[in-house]
Amino acid sequence: MSQPLILAIDQGTQSVRALLFDTTGTLVGRGYQPIEPYFSDRPGWAEQHPTYFWDNLGQACQALWENTGATPDQVVGVTVTTQRGTVVTLDNQGQPLRPAILWLDQRHADIQERLPGPWGWLFRGLRLDDTIDQFRRNAQANWLSQHEPDTWQRTRHYLLLSGYLNYRLTGQFRDSTASQVGYLPFDFRRHQWAGQRNFKWQLMPVRKDQLPELVRPGETLGQLTAEAATHLGLTSGLPVIAAASDKACEVLGSGGLTPDTACLSYGTTATINVSNPRYVEPVRLMPPYPSAIPGHYSTEVMIYRGYWMVSWFKREFGLREQRIAEHRGIEPEVLFDELVNSVPPGSMGLMLQPYWSPGVRHPGPDAKGAMVGFGDVHTRAHIYRAILEGLAYALREGKERIERRSGTEITTLRVAGGGSRSNAAM
């Protein structure tokens, strides 16, 4: 019998990857499809058509079969992980009503009045009403109901991107509990939709019947439909297994299984995560997200625009290195590492505050990025090193906060994400 394989699909912000693993976790095949992260019809908006994600998922699978010796009949199961917090609205026929609103989107609902009733009184008494109102402003459902009421009226299914792709794979509206990261009426302590009397239902107009059925990671979501099987180049009827969000899978894959082991993610969003069987909030009223390990929590500190800032620097200031790298047939990262190494630690007093986009609770919705300490000695190289150092210090601050909140010392660091390929960043 040929070796059984699992097809894992990673739908990220900038690419789709179709990955084949054997039963020991060894990668045996890879297909890669770059995508346009989003389009923006207005400043601060970030949208993409749901069908665009699905079409490119198929392209990634096609690239996989063209570049591996493995065959589709070896695949015994399929699983999907996606970017977090991207919202898809479908009508009663399962068709998208509008472009997906990505996690990068910066639009806000207009909140004029405080939350009424007993919950509102309680939050005002605890001085948490500003936090609650920020949640209401950020919830995409509130913006949709205010600015696109016809669309919201027709919304039968309110899904994250993971739920949409699992629907396209199985024909069922089911999703993993470990993928529910966003502005949703989700009980992060119990890993289920919030109870009927929970205050979260008052924060947004979402109904429970609009949400998918939830399944624990590792359990079966459904079977691959004939249409989806053709799209992926597989046999219909294969089990589709519940995975987790991309960050949660990254933590699991890097071996972050215990509270004393932290996973640093050098991705578009830079994070430090710790898996814990206990519910530990990194900041008060900021819940730990569901872990890929059933029944566990992922305590996370996030730098929203993390290693996106590295891409920003390369785009705005790194054209020379990119052209030289193309001419020499090497990766641009080699030259950028040389740029960093030409500058002493500390960037000769140039410091960066890495908040190109604000946080909800920390550092707060009004935070701004800044570079401080410029002098006549500073060059592009100093700016680049200051970016890396600013991110590193922000992640260190996150590590220390998690240690204080959990009462557990972090003794091991695991590093993942695109930025981990840079020796200078490491």
Q: Where are the language model's segments positioned?
A:
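Short alpha-helix plus adjacent loop in nuclease-associated cores
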Residues: I101, D105-G120
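A short local loop/turn or secondary-structure capping micro-motif enriched for an aromatic residue
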Residues: E36-F39, Q106-H108, Y307-W308
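Short beta-strand-loop/turn "lid" adjacent to the catalytic site in phosphate-handling enzymes
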Residues: E66-W103, D129-F135, N166-F186, E213-G218
